[in-house]
Swiss-Prot record:
Bilayer disposition of the protein: Single-pass membrane protein
Listed transmembrane segments: 36-56
Lineage: Eukaryota, Viridiplantae, Streptophyta, Embryophyta, Tracheophyta
UniProt subunit comment: PSII is composed of 1 copy each of membrane proteins PsbA, PsbB, PsbC, PsbD, PsbE, PsbF, PsbH, PsbI, PsbJ, PsbK, PsbL, PsbM, PsbT, PsbX, PsbY, PsbZ, Psb30/Ycf12, at least 3 peripheral proteins of the oxygen-evolving complex and a large number of cofactors. It forms dimeric complexes.
Name the record gives this protein: Photosystem II reaction center protein K
Length: 61
């Protein structure tokens, strides 16, 4: 269980910090979308966690 938790933390941290290494900027017209674009790499991790919540809801059938 601890290994799975560590893997999730590593994936979450790499998703958060990988975007800081990319120095591309959005055009001025899309500058208001910066917070959404910064959050986008984390979305697959949330789907991964949602799978565990779903399985817990159906009692891991």
């Amino acid at each position: 269980m601890l290994n799975i938790f560590n893997l999730i933390c590593i994936c979450f941290n790499s998703a958060l910090f990988s975007s800081s290494f990319l120095f591309a900027k959005l055009p001025e017209a899309y500058a208001f979308l910066n917070p959404i674009v910064d959050f986008m790499p984390v979305i697959p991790v949330l789907f991964f966690l949602l799978a565990f919540v779903w399985q817990a809801a159906v009692s891991f059938r």
